[in-house]
């Protein structure tokens, strides 16, 4: 926003911006409106808009019931969008205990777990397993980074699903994976995955 708005206009515009993108941080909103973070927090409270973590949780709760292949609590991160058999988005904020002590870089298996659980979540099947994973860690993830993962089902052939997952931190790709998942029939889990 180029010019500072008066409070009434700022409150109206803040509501519009958060409705458009509920994942704005208070810092991002403060920068957008050229005010302090404290002002944004007070404005949010006045409008009855919860903090980011609560907004993400509310959106995620609406999506967990759609997942078939795993239980919602098994998903790494908050599932904020899901279209079964097509695509999904999750947000994950690693905690300090997930990082290496010396470098403060998040351990790779947490990043992979977010991608894997999202890939399994988008599959329109009662049970699914990763058969093949081709992954690439592109940049280190640090404490305080917010990971946004997007999964897309590229192709389905028989009981095989081809899913691409991209994870970004502030629009910078930090991880990508191409997964081949096999949906398992509930009465026969002995089938070969690949």
Curated annotation (Swiss-Prot):
Which stretch is the leader sequence?
A: none
Gene Ontology molecular function: DNA binding; DNA-binding transcription factor activity
Give the record's keywords alphabetically.
DNA-binding, Fatty acid biosynthesis, Fatty acid metabolism, Lipid biosynthesis, Lipid metabolism, Repressor, Transcription, Transcription regulation
Q: Which SUPFAM superfamilies does this entry report, sorted A to Z?
A: Thioesterase/thiol ester dehydrase-isomerase
Q: Does Membrane show up as a keyword for this record?
A: no
Which stretches are transmembrane?
none
In Pfam terms, one family for this protein is 4HBT
Set out the biological process GO terms recorded for this chain's protein.
fatty acid biosynthetic process; negative regulation of DNA-templated transcription; negative regulation of fatty acid biosynthetic process
Q: Which family does it belong to?
A: Belongs to the FapR family.
What does this protein's UniProt record list under function? Transcriptional factor involved in regulation of membrane lipid biosynthesis by repressing genes involved in fatty acid and phospholipid metabolism.
- The protein in question is named Transcription factor FapR
Species classification: Bacteria, Bacillati, Bacillota, Clostridia, Thermoanaerobacterales
């Amino acid at each position: 926003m180029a010019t500072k708005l008066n409070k009434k206009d700022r409150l109206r515009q803040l509501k519009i911006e958060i409705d458009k993108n509920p994942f704005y941080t208070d810092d991002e909103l403060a920068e957008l409106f050229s005010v302090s973070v404290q002002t944004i927090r007070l404005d949010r409270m006045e409008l009855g808009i919860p903090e980011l973590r609560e907004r993400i949780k509310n959106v995620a709760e609406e999506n967990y019931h759609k997942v078939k292949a795993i239980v919602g609590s098994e998903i790494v991160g908050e599932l904020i969008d899901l279209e079964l058999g097509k695509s999904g988005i999750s947000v994950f904020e690693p905690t300090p205990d997930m990082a290496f002590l010396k470098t403060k870089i998040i351990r790779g298996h947490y990043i992979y777990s977010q991608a894997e659980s999202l890939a399994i979540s988008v599959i329109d099947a009662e049970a699914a397993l990763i058969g093949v994973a081709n992954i690439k860690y592109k940049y280190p993830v640090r404490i305080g980074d917010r990971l946004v993962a997007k999964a897309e089902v590229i192709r389905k052939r028989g009981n095989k699903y081809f899913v691409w997952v991209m994870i970004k931190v502030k629009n910078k790709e930090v991880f990508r994976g191409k997964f081949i998942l096999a949906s398992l029939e509930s009465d026969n889990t002995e089938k070969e995955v690949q």
